[in-house]
């Protein structure tokens, strides 16, 4: 089977780190020899600098919504071209903590940035490059934020209003409903049930991929 790009998406507190561990474990059980993990924003020296700016902001300066989304796409193109595509080319599988769907949901939905601009940015930066599978961990914003707060200090994005995350979730769900490569999973369940659902979804998808070979 050819190398694949799998992405884990969701709001704060959805359990993406746990999901990553489950996915990597399942891929290794399946005999995948090399699995590369990435996160967005981040993953290259420049992208990590941009991550800090997006997450923490700049003292004394308001970070505008458009500046935010442009930095996210700058970080994304660095990661895709310097890490993800080379890994896939050598036969490795890539598991990403967030990708373009995050921008479409957070900046397009949460921030309310014009849909045409979001599509233009995506098409310009990524072209036809997209994940083979996205696991969207759906969780009510209030529940997710409570989990995030329990981890400690919140970053600039995590401090947004509940209404912001409601809009973000709504956009996630709308996009997932029209894209067959996105699998929506109930992340509000107990951890054991979520992990089991991830394994089941991934195994079913792997079986479908093997059937196409």
Swiss-Prot record:
InterPro entries, alphabetized: P-loop_NTPase, Thymidylate_kin-like_dom, Thymidylate_kin_CS, Thymidylate_kinase
Domain of life where this protein originates: Bacteria
Key words, A-Z: ATP-binding, Kinase, Nucleotide biosynthesis, Nucleotide-binding, Transferase
Positions with a binding annotation for ATP: 10-17
GO molecular function terms attached to this record: ATP binding; dTMP kinase activity
Main enzyme class: transferase
Record-linked Gene3D superfamilies: P-loop containing nucleotide triphosphate hydrolases (3.40.50.300)
Cellular component annotations (GO), alphabetically ordered: cytosol
Enzyme Commission (EC) number: 2.7.4.9
SUPFAM superfamilies in the cross-refs: P-loop containing nucleoside triphosphate hydrolases (SSF52540)
Alphabetical list of PROSITE patterns matching this protein: THYMIDYLATE_KINASE
Pfam family, one: Thymidylate_kin
Catalytic reaction equation(s): dTMP + ATP = dTDP + ADP
A Gene Ontology biological process term: dTTP biosynthetic process
Function in brief: Phosphorylation of dTMP to form dTDP in both de novo and salvage pathways of dTTP synthesis.
PANTHER family (UniProt xref): THYMIDYLATE KINASE, UMP-CMP KINASE 2, MITOCHONDRIAL
UniProt family annotation: Belongs to the thymidylate kinase family.
Listed name of the protein: Thymidylate kinase
